[in-house]
Amino acid sequence: MSDIVWAAMQNVGAPEWGQEAVNVAREIQSSLGMEPMTAPFLEDCSQLRSPQEAEAILRQDLPPSQTNSTSDDYTDMTWHTPTARFYVARPALKPAPKGPYPSWVMNALGGIPATIDPMVTTAAKILSVSALRLLQDKVARDRVMAEFKTRTGGGIGGKTWMAPLCDYAPPLDFKWPEYVETPRGRQF
């Protein structure tokens, strides 16, 4: 599956921020008292990395015993359907000369159409190209399902498959927390 998504990424390319986005970024830098940069976005935001290279970078910060990088829906879904994770860079500015940018900068870049739309559009194109490939290419579908069945020991319900819910009764008898005011503030 990752090969299919990687091929789609190479076909679509990385996000490209146009002049309007550059102007927004430069305006932010100027508002912070910086000399606006000619090319304010990190070069990494406009580069592709193979799944293997991206995984190696991600694993640098994980203990060797940790299987998954996060505890989100993605890791859960990999047990129920063939899945590939990919990242498309959100807009990020090159480092400021006198320390980090305030946190509002990242939030602003994620909410301004000129700066966030290239990321969203690129991700949508990658998803679309990948889905079309799977719909049109039976050999690719068969390869993806074979990998899924190997990884799960036979697919859903297979020998190494992990069920979505706990294999024990859920602990539903906990009391609802009572919030109280203490000298340290509100606690439960």
At which residue positions do the language-model features occur?
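Metal-dependent amide/peptide-bond hydrolase catalytic core
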Residues: 1-188
